């Protein structure tokens, strides 16, 4: 039986705190905290969870964590807000350059995308 939490099917053969990291917005440390609050041993595999344990985990996540779609939309709204107010980070988001001071002369290919070739300038004849 697959256990589904906030729209994500958790892998059955992984330990609980690793399986919870498949949910967007939950890392290892927050997964351990969630399992401790729910009273579930973190080393039990997901397939061995009872329905009560899964329900307790759902309750803890629902009460105290913003995950999946809500978190994704909040991040997108934060980026949109930066672009709307026209701050430095917003401008860099808009033109697709690194935000945090990295050099862009030679690198930053991940952020800038595939290389665009520019035609060579004609050399002045002597």
Curated annotation (Swiss-Prot):
Q: Which InterPro entries match?
A: Rbsml_uS13_C (IPR027437), Ribosomal_uS13 (IPR001892), Ribosomal_uS13-like_H2TH (IPR010979), Ribosomal_uS13_bac-type (IPR019980), Ribosomal_uS13_CS (IPR018269)
Question: Where do the record's region annotations for Disordered lie?
Answer: 99-126
Family, according to the entry, reads as follows: Belongs to the universal ribosomal protein uS13 family.
Query: What protein name is recorded for this chain?
Result: Small ribosomal subunit protein uS13
Q: Which GO terms of type biological process are on file?
A: translation
> What PROSITE patterns is this protein classified in?
RIBOSOMAL_S13_1 (PS00646), RIBOSOMAL_S13_2 (PS50159)
Its assembly, as annotated, is: Part of the 30S ribosomal subunit. Forms a loose heterodimer with protein S19. Forms two bridges to the 50S subunit in the 70S ribosome.
Q: Where is the composition biased (Basic residues)?
A: 108-126
Q: Which HAMAP family does this entry report, sorted A to Z? A: Ribosomal_uS13 (MF_01315)
Q: Which Gene3D superfamilies match?
A: 1.10.8.50, 30s ribosomal protein s13, domain 2
Whether Ribosomal protein counts among this entry's keywords is: yes
Q: Does the keyword Endoplasmic reticulum apply?
A: no
Entries under PANTHER family matching the protein: 30S RIBOSOMAL PROTEIN S13/40S RIBOSOMAL PROTEIN S18, SMALL RIBOSOMAL SUBUNIT PROTEIN US13M
Tell me which GO cellular component terms the UniProt record holds: cytosol; small ribosomal subunit
């Amino acid at each position: 039986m697959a256990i589904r939490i906030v729209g994500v099917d958790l892998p059955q053969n992984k330990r609980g705190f690793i399986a919870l990291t498949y949910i967007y917005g939950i890392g290892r440390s927050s997964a351990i905290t969630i399992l401790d609050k729910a009273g579930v041993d973190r080393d039990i595999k997901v397939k061995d969870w009872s329905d009560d344990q899964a329900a307790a985990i759902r309750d803890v996540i629902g009460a105290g964590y913003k995950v999946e779609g809500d978190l994704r939309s909040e991040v997108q709204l934060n980026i949109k807000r930066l672009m709307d107010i026209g701050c430095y980070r917003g401008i860099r988001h808009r033109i697709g350059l690194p935000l945090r001071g990295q050099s862009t002369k030679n690198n930053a290919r991940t952020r800038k995308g595939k290389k665009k070739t520019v035609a060579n300038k004609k050399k002045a004849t002597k």
